Regions:
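Oxidoreductase and adenylate-handling cofactor-binding alpha/beta cores
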Residues: 174-194, 207-218, 260-267
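Short, surface-exposed loop/helix-turn segments at secondary-structure junctions
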Residues: 47-50, 215-226, 326-340
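Conserved Rossmann-fold dehydrogenase catalytic segment
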Residues: 130, 158-168, 189-205, 224-231, ...
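N-terminal helix-loop segment corresponding to the beta1-alpha1 unit
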Residues: 1-190, 368, 374-400
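Terminal low-complexity tails and localization/encapsulation signals of metabolic enzymes
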Residues: 1-10, 234, 240-241, 322-400
Length: 400
């Protein structure tokens, strides 16, 4: 990588599936040299996701692992484990979503690694934080959606417990992990020493949910029930127009009054249910019904033009297919095309955020399993004979 704010930072990434790879992809997108350490079987996401041209290179894996290099090590073998420890001794950051007791058994606890690398930032992404009864239990996204209350919010909104059809707890926790790694790197600049970070999925998502839905139970004793009634309303969704759907968000008084004018209901500006933000919140369901009825009068494009002129927040309802061809995303070059060395032409996204002080971050393809094993071993100072022996004994693999 070059030109990003994390240029010069080396990250050893011992993570799999989504939560960890999202964290390390974020660091890689902004310039870090991320070395993905994989077992001989490879990251589970290589094969568990549908959609691929070749085995072990699913579309999801390609999306979550761009801008990284891959080294394939069997750390059950001493030589493979020694390579991993040597890699970590050269790193600024080590990030893993292996459960802590497994890391400790392998001699990969923070206390073990900090002896050789006291400046190491050691990030452990776990399901549940230390000190609680769930610590060391395995966790995946639906487990955390269930226990954190995410599924319960959908139950209250739709009438049945459901998961958000995205791995949102993985995405959210992965992004938070990248964020706190940045905080730790900043502190290291001031102190000169590293530290261990624990990033628990459950606690982070419990914070996410309760920030919105603890509401009246913030007070002791509670002054009302949990839940944001506006967000849990069955009308909190895209609403139908004459020919499709649209989402409108008239929250301020100016926006709400402009919306009432647009739908031909100016009298609602003085209706005591809707004349200020507090009253609109208290009468959220009635406010949604007004919007629902008003929006049926015109087409989506007609409404978008009217709302743009009146500065009322509104946007079209996009299908996933629409997103892939959204004119705004095309204008900002969000999607690009890449010739992958083994997968051929693929569509890819770019990092969403930009920095005025940095150059354009170079983009490299998601690696095949063990694609960079030999070159990384060479960087670590291993001789050709040593590398050959590691490959022959299966301690290191060139992959495929």
């Amino acid at each position: 990588m070059s030109g990003g704010p994390l240029e010069g930072i080396r990250v050893i990434d011992q993570t799999t599936v989504v939560v960890g790879p999202i964290c390390s992809r974020t660091l890689a997108d902004y310039g870090a040299d991320v070395i993905k350490v994989e077992a001989p079987s490879g990251d589970l996401l290589r094969t568990m996701a549908k959609g691929s041209r070749n085995p072990g290179m699913s579309g999801k894996f390609l999306n979550f692992n761009r801008n990284k290099r891959s080294i394939c090590l069997d750390i059950k073998k001493k030589a493979g484990l020694d390579v991993l420890k040597k890699l970590i001794s050269t790193a600024d950051v080590f990030v893993s979503n292996v459960r802590p007791q497994g890391l400790a058994r392998a001699g990969l606890a923070y206390e073990d690694l900090a002896k050789d690398n006291p400046k190491l930032i050691y990030c452990s992404i776990v399901g549940f934080g230390k000190g609680g009864r769930y610590y060391n239990r395995p966790a995946y996204d639906p487990i955390i959606q269930s226990v954190s209350g995410v599924a319960a919010t959908l139950h209250r909104a739709t009438g049945e417990p459901r998961f958000v059809p995205m791995v949102m707890t993985d995405h959210t926790t992965g992004l938070i992990a990248a964020q706190v790694i940045g905080f730790a790197l900043y502190r290291r600049e001031k102190t000169g020493v590293g530290e261990a970070i624990e990033v628990p999925m459950f606690e982070n998502m419990a914070s996410f949910v309760t920030s919105e839905h603890m509401g009246a139970c913030t007070f002791d004793p509670p002054v009302g029930p949990t839940g944001d009634g506006r967000l849990l309303s069955p009308y909190y969704r895209p609403l139908a127009t004459k020919d499709g759907f649209i989402t409108v968000g008239p929250n301020t008084n100016d926006q709400a009054f402009a919306f009432f004018d647009a739908i031909g209901r100016p009298e609602l500006k003085t209706d005591p249910r809707f004349d200020n933000a507090a009253n609109r919140t208290s009468n959220a369901e009635a406010y949604f019904i007004v919007r629902k009825e008003g929006l049926l009068k015109k087409t989506t494009e007609e409404w978008l033009k009217i709302f743009e002129e009146k500065d009322v927040p509104a946007q079209r309802y996009n299908t996933i297919e629409d997103v892939l061809d959204d004119p705004h995303l095309n204008e900002v070059n969000f999607f690009g095309s890449e010739e992958h060395p083994s997968e051929g032409k693929i569509k890819r996204t770019r990092p969403a955020n930009t920095f005025s002080g940095g150059g354009r971050i170079s983009q490299s393809h998601a690696p095949r399993l063990g694609e960079n094993t030999l070159s990384i071993l060479g960087e670590l100072g291993y001789s050709e004979a040593e590398i050959k022996e590691m490959v022959e004994t299966g301690s290191a693999n060139q992959g495929n």
